[in-house]
């Protein structure tokens, strides 16, 4: 069974998914509707504004016609490493043979590396960045340089 692991992003005031969170979630809904994945795991804990990232994704997925039975929630994680680590029991419960990590293209290589180092068979699928705010996209891309170095350091054991 292929399961999409949707990595979290910010929730804005009033529980509104940020553009990044919305883009990832809608992309995952498309994978489910297209039959490319059989279940979805929304990952992400509580940031600055409620609800948790995972709950904001669940609400958006439901509004896009994904049934609640196809959605699992990992609502405690605070970063990419925790997203994947804390989703592993949910993947096992679902009998997942492969995780399809749904995140932005700039983030996908690090997320795949973490997943593989944690023993998951993982690929990634990224939404289009068309219409994204260019300065934000550039900042996210540049952030991946130190974030990847930190991930390698954390996973060295």
Question: How would you label these PLM feature ranges?
Answer:
Residues 1-141:
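A structural signal for short, hydrophobic/glycine-enriched beta-strand patches
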Residues 134-157:
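A transmembrane-helix-recognition feature enriched in membrane-embedded lipid enzymes
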């Amino acid at each position: 069974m292929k399961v999409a692991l949707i990595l979290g992003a910010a929730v804005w005031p009033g529980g509104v998914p940020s553009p990044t969170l919305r883009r990832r979630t809608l992309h995952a809904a498309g994978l489910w509707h297209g039959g490319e994945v059989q279940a979805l795991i929304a990952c992400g804990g509580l940031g600055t504004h409620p609800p948790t990232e995972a709950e904001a994704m669940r609400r958006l997925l439901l509004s896009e016609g994904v049934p609640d039975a196809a959605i699992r929630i990992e609502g405690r994680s605070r970063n990419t490493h925790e997203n994947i680590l804390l989703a592993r029991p949910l993947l096992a419960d679902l009998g997942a043979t492969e995780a399809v990590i749904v995140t932005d293209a700039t983030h996908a290589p690090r997320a795949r590396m973490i997943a593989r180092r944690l023993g998951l068979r993982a690929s990634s699928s990224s939404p289009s960045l068309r219409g994204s705010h260019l300065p934000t996209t550039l900042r996210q891309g540049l952030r991946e340089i130190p974030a990847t170095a930190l991930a390698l350091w954390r996973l060295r054991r």
